[in-house]
Amino acid sequence: GENWKDVPDNKLFVIDLTTNPPAQIATVEVGKQPSGLSINKAGNLALVANRADNSISVLSISGKDVKLIDTVPMGEQVAHVVFTPDGKRALVAKFPGHKIGVLDVDGQKVTDTKHNMNVGLWPYNVDVTPNGALALTADNGNSGASDGNVDTVSVIDLEATPPRVIDRVVVGDAPEGLTISPKGNLAAVV
C-alpha cells in the first residue's frame, strides 16, 4: 500500500555450515542494504557490497569468528563484488554508474584504485574465470526491471594493464545472475 516504506537493513548473518541443519551463529553489522558478498579462496577475508551505503565492507574471518575491520567508500551505489582467484584484486559492480571498479587487496587492506571500466547499462553481477584472465558482467539494462529489450554481458580482460572491456555479448532481457563454471569454459546468465 501507500504507507509501505523500504528501509534497508545493515545485517550480515554468519551461518555455520558444519552443523546439521546449518545454524546462524552470529550477526555482523555492515553498511546499509548488503547486496553482494565474496569470500577469498584462503577463506580469511570477505567483502560485502552495500548498495544504500555506497561502500564495501571488509570482514576478517578466523574459524567461525567474523569481524568488520574496514569500510571502503565507493562514491556510488554498488551491487556486487568478487575477488580475483589470486585474492589480490576485487571487482565491484557500480550499478547506476554503468561501471566496474577495481579494488587492490593487500592482506586485509583493501583500497579503491579509482580505475573504472564502462560496461553495459546497470551491471548487477560480475564473476571472474578460474584462471583470473577474464571477468564477465551481467548488465541488467534497466535498473532491475524487465523492459522487453535485449541486454548484454560485458567481457573484461584482466590481464591488460589496466584491465579493460574487450567485448559485449547480447543476451536476453534483464540478466541479474551470472556464474562461470569451475573449468572456466562455460558461463550461465539468468
Predicted feature locations:
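Predominantly soluble domains enriched in secretory-pathway, periplasmic, or organellar proteins
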Residues: 1-190
